[in-house]
Amino acid sequence: MTSLREFRKLCCDIYHASGYKEKSKLIRDFITDRDDKYLIIKLLLPGLDDRIYNMNDKQIIKLYSIIFKQSQEDMLQDLGYGYIGDTIRTFFKENTEIRPRDKSILTLEDVDSFLTTLSSVTKESHQIKLLTDIASVCTCNDLKCVVMLIDKDLKIKAGPRYVLNAISPNAYDVFRKSNNLKEIIENSSKQNLDSISISVMTPINPMLAESCDSVNKAFKKFPSGMFAEVKYDGERVQVHKNNNEFAFFSRNMKPVLSHKVDYLKEYIPKAFKKATSIVLDSEIVLVDEHNVPLPFGSLGIHKKKEYKNSNMCLFVFDCLYFDGFDMTDIPLYERRSFLKDVMVEIPNRIVFSELTNISNESQLTDVLDDALTRKLEGLVLKDINGVYEPGKRRWLKIKRDYLNEGSMADSADLVVLGAYYGKGAKGGIMAVFLMGCYDDESGKWKTVTKCSGHDDNTLRVLQDQLTMIKINKDPKKIPEWLVVNKIYIPDFVVEDPKQSQIWEISGAEFTSSKSHTANGISIRFPRFTRIREDKTWKESTHLNDLVNLTKS
């Protein structure tokens, strides 16, 4: 059984390794001949763990300030300079309530058991007891590691591809398809990963689209032909049905709020009368009595009340699994034809997505113009012979910003990293916001632009919604995770960028700026479009995505 001390050393070695091959080799050598491979890999990828601990960095600080009898304010201030694990380690070492162990005695199994128990409690008193108990058997470095596992970020600069491909060269691609880590580990020794396929009731990484700024580019990418599909301004939903059981997952593979999808349990069996088990890729949209889509955000309970005679409608655009058959390796035109054979439309409830087989540039231009005239968001272009590749950006999207707002082919989903005091009537409150993106290579957050222009009501709400730490533009208080030039140091920084809001930002065009740290990329005339509540930081626009957007 692997000890926590061995695991910590592995994490340290991975962090200091120079590149992909070296990191993967370290992991491969470490897990060879070990019986607890699955546990090691699972804990190396805490972000994929579906256990919920009901506590963010601020809550962890609060609880350990009580346990250590230390100043919560001092601990929060220390957190502003670095990461939660370092802060807890520092104050654990200094506290006089619980003496840290001199020697590590915990196994990974002990830690995993603790995490499972922690995920089962919600009362603060129970959390305090569990956190006290684990601290009492930890060294300072042990507790730092445990807290980082709770925070779901080990800071080892190695994501799923690095870790999973240490098991087998194609393990990462198989995982994106099956989302079943345990099955991959169990089959890795048999060299039989290709046999692993979709599992009903387990979410699949959705296939994605990259931006496209010209009709000509689309034909270069799909020379053998393409489908142009209406880009619906709703919420992506992956539908799973297994006999009489149903599951509905969002684009980030989390369960969809029940009020948005409960009605589907009645209509899916009617639309798919022959299906025992099925997995669908689709979009749920609020439509009026004429089946015309209503604006994004109208799916909320309160917003829906504003639209009388409206219905939730599922626009189905793909079938990924049907009665034991994994259909992801079948060409799109065959999947679509099959879908037509097995699905019966229920008007205003479950319908086919609007799809056009494109044969020339003039036809594509006409379809795009028609979509924009109807005030739809744009088009998604798909290779007519394309297979379904989970998690990969093989499709193209053309949105209205490309034609109507200048040369930005697409908006960017940026994370709120900080804020500045407003001026005049907005003085004394956060009114201007620092937006940025995550750099996968460095593990840091980079700045892209400042954004303002919110109305008074929105600003009032944001004061409470955004969890900020006041740093008063002090360079010494810039957290380790943020890379920002001196002229853009904010009055406030977010407590945790991975828990911060994601805003869709559009503008006139992407520009070059030596003052911003996201490879010098910024946005001219940036404007807030909407909050992307359907996305986590992982689905936001990362630095490499931003670079691709500017190229297109």
Curated annotation (Swiss-Prot):
Name of the top EC class for this enzyme: ligase
Cofactor(s) recorded in Swiss-Prot or TrEMBL: Mg(2+)
Induction: Expressed in the early phase of the viral replicative cycle.
Entry superkingdom: Viruses
A GO biological process held by the record: DNA recombination
A Gene Ontology molecular function term of the record: metal ion binding
GO CC terms, sorted: host cell cytoplasm
Residues given in the record as Mg(2+) 2 binding sites: E377
Reactions listed under catalytic activity: ATP + (deoxyribonucleotide)n-3'-hydroxyl + 5'-phospho-(deoxyribonucleotide)m = (deoxyribonucleotide)n+m + AMP + diphosphate
Active site per database record: K231 (n6-amp-lysine intermediate)
Annotated positions binding Mg(2+) 1: E283
Annotated family: Belongs to the ATP-dependent DNA ligase family.
Name the UniProt record assigns to this protein: DNA ligase
Biological source species: Vaccinia virus (strain Copenhagen)
